[in-house]
């Protein structure tokens, strides 16, 4: 058995009610879900052009704070959570050494094996933490770090709920929530989205495509979650054309709402959706499914119900919180020296 998984199953050191966890602004949606654990998160703003928290994407949770300087003496930090390998984990290692606290590393991305030389991949892979966490099994295998654990995404299914589709007489729109769709084509699939849009509009010109997110000159992000959920709940269909996102959280939130979703079949998405009719890399099939969903409410409800059930049963926030709390308890155990 994976030693990390084995240890997680037997953590029994007295736990703290609340940990103070030092991390960095990385992924607003994921951090918002991490805040559901109830612990205190101190996000260190490294400056120098590094990622900052974007309020336009998500408001800062109440138990999450931004600081420009931090000391263990002042804040009694329990451990550090790193979330990327492009400078963050290296910085976390310096903090770990200075403050003598464990590192948890959470890996969000897939290695770009087609673009990285082998030496670069080997170098990036060499950075490891006391506890290494991946968001999918595919992600874990791609990096080849076996001494690690997988934590599946969790969605707040009570908050992301209530799809009805457009009211009679309203425009039938196909929604995609994405930032930088055109500029991040290799990640988000602007080419595929444009092709599907053209195919759908040729079949049924009454169907429109809408974007939410930071797309200059086209759309803006929605930080108010209730308004965001309302946008999902009123769409006729949700589309995702991502190529390199292991787990597109916006897709999962739309699925949780019960919106009928059509997506590319990349990375972990087929495993999440479990429906080859609407999860495909065939652009003609994607277009045909969108047209059918937009014009057949009974079919749309069927697809949407399946989408929601997949999230409720397999990716709920309760399981996510429990998994992370086990990891935090293990990090605490490592810190006090009972597991090395």
Question: Which residues does each predicted region cover?
Answer:
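Conserved catalytic-core segment of nucleotide-activated headgroup transferases in glycan assembly
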Residues: 142, 156-218
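Short alpha-helical segment that forms part of, or immediately flanks, the ligand-binding pocket
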Residues: 229, 251-256, 267-270
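Short hydrophobic beta-strand element within catalytic cores of glycosyltransferases
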Residues: 259-263
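Conserved acidic donor-binding segment of nucleotide-sugar-dependent glycosyltransferases
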Residues: 275-284, 292-297
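A charged, aromatic-enriched C-terminal amphipathic alpha-helix characteristic of glycosyltransferases
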Residues: 295-339
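Aromatic "clamp/platform" in nucleotide-sugar-dependent glycosyltransferases that forms part
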Residues: 243
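A short hydrophobic beta-strand element within the catalytic core of glycosyltransferases
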Residues: 238-239
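Short acidic/histidine- and often glycine-rich active-site loop of Leloir-type glycosyltransferases
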Residues: 265-279
């Amino acid at each position: 058995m994976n030693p990390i998984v084995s240890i997680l199953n037997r953590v029994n050191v007295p736990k703290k009610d609340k940990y103070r966890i030092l991390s960095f602004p990385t992924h607003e949606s994921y951090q918002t879900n991490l805040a559901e654990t109830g612990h205190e998160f101190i996000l260190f703003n490294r400056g120098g052009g590094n990622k900052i928290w974007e309020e336009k994407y998500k408001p800062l949770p109440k138990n999450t704070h931004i600081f420009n300087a931090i000391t263990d003496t002042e804040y009694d930090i329990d451990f550090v959570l790193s979330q990327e390998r492009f400078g963050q984990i290296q910085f976390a290692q310096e903090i770990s050494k200075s403050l003598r606290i464990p590192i948890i590393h959470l890996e969000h991305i897939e290695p770009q094996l087609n673009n990285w030389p082998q030496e670069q991949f080997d170098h990036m892979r060499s950075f490891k933490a006391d506890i290494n966490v991946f968001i999918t099994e595919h992600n874990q295998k791609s990096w080849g770090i076996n001494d690690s654990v997988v934590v599946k995404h969790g969605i707040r299914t009570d908050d992301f709920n209530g799809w009805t589709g457009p009211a009679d007489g309203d425009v039938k729109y196909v929604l995609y929530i994405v930032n930088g769709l055109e500029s991040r084509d290799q990640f988000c699939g602007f080419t595929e989205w444009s092709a599907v849009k053209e195919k759908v509009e040729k079949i049924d010109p009454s169907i429109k495509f809408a974007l939410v997110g930071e797309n200059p000159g086209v759309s803006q992000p929605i930080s108010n979650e209730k308004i965001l959920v309302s946008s999902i709940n009123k769409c006729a269909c949700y589309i995702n054309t991502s190529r390199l996102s292991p787990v597109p959280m916006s897709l999962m939130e739309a699925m949780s709402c019960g919106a009928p979703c059509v997506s590319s079949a990349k990375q972990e998405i087929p495993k999440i959706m479990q429906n080859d009719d609407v999860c495909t890399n065939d652009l003609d099939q994607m277009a045909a499914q969108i047209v059918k969903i937009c014009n057949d409410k009974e079919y749309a409800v069927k697809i949407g119900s399946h989408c929601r059930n997949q999230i409720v049963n397999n990716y709920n926030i309760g399981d996510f919180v429990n998994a992370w709390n086990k990891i935090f308890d293990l990090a605490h155990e490592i810190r006090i020296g009972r597991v090395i």
